């Protein structure tokens, strides 16, 4: 596991000892990948005591109509899982009517109509602000991380923002903050259901 093969003169492979890297040198407290509309924030790397938030929207292939989807991880468990793709995978009625739609993604559905075409959809969120800055690997973890993202829900034309934060209160304790705002552009709001 600490060895790799390298080519030398005459395409002869030889084993070289390679020092294993430390995960902490490559992981940052907050990481944002706009090309796939995904954001991850964490307060550490401890398998039992650290907390993590994952946010994603739809940007590219194999995506669902999920708005600002959120998953929570902590204490070694998936605490707020995304529902996945269903029993019959992509060909099932359960996928078409539930697993690919807003209610299965820990997000807000507006007036019961929030949706958009799935597969190869381009409905990403925009990162409005965050702390610490995205992709600064090797820096120490802070006691607070936050991100604020914005999304336009196309069916109801609702402007949505979601602020997520992790607050570390001790070496083994902390909590999440989730503030979701949703408002239709032209008013006439009936309901904004949080699933």
Please give the residue ranges for each predicted region.
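Single conserved hydrophobic/aromatic residue that forms the stacking wall/gate
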Residues: 2-13
């Amino acid at each position: 596991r600490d060895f790799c093969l390298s080519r030398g003169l005459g395409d002869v492979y030889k084993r070289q000892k390679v020092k294993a890297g430390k995960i902490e040198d490559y992981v940052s407290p907050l990481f944002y990948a706009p090309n796939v509309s995904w954001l991850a924030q964490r307060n550490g790397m401890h398998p039992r005591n650290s907390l993590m938030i994952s946010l994603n929207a739809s940007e590219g292939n194999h995506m669902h109509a999920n708005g600002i989807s959120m998953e929570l991880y902590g204490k070694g468990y998936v605490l707020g899982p995304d529902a996945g793709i269903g029993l019959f995978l992509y060909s099932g009625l359960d996928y078409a009517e539930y697993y690919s739609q807003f209610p299965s993604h820990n997000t807000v559905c507006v007036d019961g109509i929030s949706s958009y075409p799935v597969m190869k959809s381009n409905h990403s969120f925009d990162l409005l602000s965050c702390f610490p800055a995205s992709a600064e690997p090797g820096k120490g973890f802070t006691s607070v991380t936050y991100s604020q993202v914005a999304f336009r829900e196309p069916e109801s034309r609702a402007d949505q923002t979601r602020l997520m934060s992790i607050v570390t209160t001790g070496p083994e304790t902390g909590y999440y903050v989730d503030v979701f705002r949703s408002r239709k552009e032209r008013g006439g709001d009936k309901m904004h259901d949080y699933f």
